[in-house]
């Protein structure tokens, strides 16, 4: 049966008390996916997203599914915007890594949206955005967004950070500083001793005494991304470039691949949950060079 998003079946499997919050999060992620794809298609003259729904068969240790949307074009060389909502039992080696999973005997539920865009023009930065809700015996939000330019542009970097700062300031006064520092620490390649890009924000295990405020912040991050990144693309997509710049872009993508396959928690989570490989490996660029 094709995956059709949240339903009473999903609700019967929730492991948290506030079922309405989990349902609302899944619904928001699907809505945001649609609006982001529409904004990106407006920047790509002849490109449209392909849609592929996936679901786990009855009797599998995991249930649920998701939708992978992918577009390849002149502006967006490859962009994927995925949503998923899955539940079931974690493999034993992941129980100790996921908070509350041992207490829930490996039972978990997760929903989220994940986006990665690799651009054709070296002057348009690559971007990543992820928002998620996860529950075991505990429940929390996580996510963030970061920019990876080949040729850093001060105007674009400032606009991106200002948008995310606005979302953070609506949550609490020290949130931007905390989440920016976490991003700089997380998106770093220790073996090369260099950052992946120019940063952004990153947060995990966000579970305050007010879950509705946490969810409002997650929505604010989604709206901030939608407001700023299409503007950056529109400004830079027609900037002239030569073969040397394109070569540098491909080498920069190599750093992206190294990080995502070696360090990225989302990729490791995908490996551990038997999720759709096309979804959690969506972040890999179409062409790369070392």
What kind of feature is each model-predicted range?
Residues 17-99, 210-262:
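Gly/Pro-rich turn-and-neighbor structural signature
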Residues 21, 121, 137, 147-153, ...:
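A generic structural motif
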Residues 137-179:
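Compact, glycine/acidic-enriched structural inserts
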